């Protein structure tokens, strides 16, 4: 989850950088000319072109420094970590929404929240979350939803379905609540839909928060309650009321159960049991972890299904692995996967990692510089500068991934059929160093549970007829498929052999 700490900052810094860059004529170095295809996300591709055109994979711009050099990234995220916080000037615009939550704070305030949150992400908690909460959501809601789509023949937006699944899951692990948004058979949000109103308001508040970095006069607009700041005020009212209601309800439950954490195994109850925190502090906890899990896994899964649905050979190998794992555990009945079964799915793990390599959910990160510094590649960094690192560009570097770096090839992650991870400084999708993602394993297990369950029973076909090169994606808090992912679902009866039929 910590990998999302600069998600808003990254997006806006990128936009500002590109606007400035576009207003000036730039000449690229005469050396390496990266073969990055047009389309996809022009902003990200333009930025990647800039840093990959540099011999050191670092570019100095009018808005700061942007790099995809692994040594530089290790320096910023680990070696000289103390010199590169988020910084108040990068977090102020996000304060109305995020407060001083873990993803919008530095120093002791951040350390305290990370220390408490780290207690949640242990093997016992992951096992319960995956085998109980995620499995129930998949078996009782996701698979029936896909079955209805298969039986009716309707085309559904799989990205929307996955969004609802992720929202239900994050509410469970963050504050032990079940919105049941995936249970709505028609996926309609009525005017009285409490959770639907919050989800919509949260999205609006997040979008406007990012736009603030583009508008020099947003503070005046906020004071006068004008334009998007009026919309922001209304959205925040809904978001804050939701979060405070969650806090009040959790405190009520805790009072009934007595001192200690009680029966809940969620993040909010953990924070309440660990100290006497104000309601405002706990409100920031709720919002921060909704941010962390709201669209992240769902968007990654949308990119995953887009990629495998257009690659029958990869789809076949995943299904063969599912059959093999089932047999190894003498499980011929289907149903929920155990944590042990999911951990044995090396090829599926490789496909998910390959998805994240080419389509990192947080494609850029940014840091503020406290004191003058020199990066390992010799780049001078002045105090007060912003240093961005492009995860998107790193996934397209021949020096890391080879000449076929633009190809979707999961086998690059395997050695004799066993998954072999890369250094987090070569693959910083989950960040690295002291702020490395706490929920990395949880995210992988959750995604594997969803992917394996769906692919074991269904065939997913992209239904809009777009060629892969025509598929557009964009930044909206996280990397998203533009227009969603319209798919046609075909259901198959499960058996030892049927799972290998594409």
Curated annotation (Swiss-Prot):
GO molecular function, one term: iron ion binding
Keyword Plastid: no
Recorded superkingdom: Eukaryota
Record carries keyword Transmembrane helix: yes
Family matches, as InterPro entries: Cyt_P450, Cyt_P450_E_grp-IV, Cyt_P450_sf
Subcellular location: Membrane
EC nos: 1.14.14.-
GO CC entries: membrane
GO biological process, one term: cholesterol metabolic process
Record field: transmembrane: 3-23
UniProt-annotated binding residues for heme: 437
Main localization (coarse): membrane
Expression by tissue: Mainly expressed in leaves and, at low levels, in roots, fruits and stems.
The protein's annotated pathway: Steroid metabolism; cholesterol metabolism
Keyword list, A-Z: Cholesterol metabolism, Iron, Lipid biosynthesis, Lipid metabolism, Membrane, Metal-binding, Oxidoreductase, Steroid biosynthesis, Steroid metabolism, Sterol metabolism, Transmembrane, Transmembrane helix
One Pfam family here: p450
Membrane topology (UniProt): Single-pass membrane protein
Role description: Involved in the biosynthesis of spiroketal steroid and saponin natural products from cholesterol such as diosgenin and analogs (e.g. furostanol and spirostanol), plant defense compounds used as main precursors for the industrial production of steroid hormones. During the 5,6-spiroketalization of cholesterol, may catalyze the 27-monohydroxylation of furostanol-type steroid to an intermediate product that undergoes a stereospecific formation of the terminal heterocycle to yield diosgenin.
Protein family: Belongs to the cytochrome P450 family.
Protein's name according to its UniProt entry: Cytochrome P450 CYP94D109
The species this protein was found in: Paris polyphylla (Daiswa polyphylla)
């Amino acid at each position: 989850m910590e990998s999302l700490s600069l998600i808003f900052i990254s997006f806006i810094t990128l936009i500002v950088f590109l606007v400035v860059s576009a207003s000036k004529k730039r000449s690229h170095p005469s050396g390496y000319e990266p073969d990055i295809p047009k389309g996809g996300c022009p902003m990200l591709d333009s930025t990647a072109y800039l840093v990959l055109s540099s011999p050191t994979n670092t570019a100095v711009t009018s808005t700061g420094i942007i790099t995809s050099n692994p040594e530089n990234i290790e320096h910023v995220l680990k070696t000289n970590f103390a010199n590169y916080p988020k910084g108040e000037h990068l977090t102020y615009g996000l304060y109305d929404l995020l407060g001083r939550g873990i993803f919008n704070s530095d120093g002791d305030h951040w350390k305290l929240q990370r220390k408490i949150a780290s207690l949640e992400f242990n093997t016992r908690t992951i096992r319960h979350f995956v085998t109980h909460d995620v499995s129930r959501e998949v078996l009782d809601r996701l698979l029936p939803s896909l079955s209805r789509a298969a039986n009716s023949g309707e085309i559904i937006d799989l990205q929307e379905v996955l969004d609802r699944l992720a929202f239900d899951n994050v509410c469970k692990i963050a504050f032990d609540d079940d919105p049941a948004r995936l249970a709505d058979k028609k996926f309609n949000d009525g005017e009285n839909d409490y959770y639907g109103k919050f989800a919509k308001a949260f999205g609006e508040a997040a979008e406007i928060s990012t736009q603030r970095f583009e508008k020099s006069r947003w503070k005046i607009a906020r004071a006068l309650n004008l334009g998007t700041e009026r919309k922001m005020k209304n959205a925040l009212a809904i978001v804050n009321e939701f979060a405070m209601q969650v806090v009040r309800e959790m405190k009520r439950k805790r009072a009934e159960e007595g001192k200690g954490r009680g029966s809940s195994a969620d993040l909010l109850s953990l924070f309440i049991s660990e100290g006497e925190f104000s309601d405002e502090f706990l409100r920031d906890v709720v919002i921060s972890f909704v941010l962390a899990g709201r669209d992240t896994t769902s968007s990654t899964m949308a990119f995953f299904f887009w990629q495998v649905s257009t690659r029958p050979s990869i789809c076949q190998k995943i299904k063969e692995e599912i059959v093999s794992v089932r047999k190894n555990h003498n499980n011929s009945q289907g149903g929920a996967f155990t944590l042990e079964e999911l951990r044995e799915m090396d090829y599926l793990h490789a496909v998910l990692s390959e998805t994240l390599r080419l389509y990192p959910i947080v494609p850029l990160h940014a840091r503020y510089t406290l004191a003058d510094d020199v990066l390992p590649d010799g780049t001078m960094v002045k105090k007060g500068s912003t240093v961005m690192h492009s995860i998107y560009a790193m996934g397209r570097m021949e020096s890391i991934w080879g000449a076929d770096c633009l190809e979707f090839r999961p086998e690059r992650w395997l050695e004799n059929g066993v998954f072999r991870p890369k250094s987090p400084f070569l693959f910083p999708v989950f960040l690295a160093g002291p702020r490395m993602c706490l929920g990395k394993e949880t995210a992988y297990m959750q995604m594997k549970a969803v992917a394996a369950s769906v692919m074991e029973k269904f065939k997913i076909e992209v239904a809009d007829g777009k060629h892969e090169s025509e598929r557009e994606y964009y930044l909206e808090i996280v990397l998203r498929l533009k227009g969603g992912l319209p798919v046609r679902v075909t259901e198959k009866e499960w058996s030892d052999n049927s799972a290998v039929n594409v």
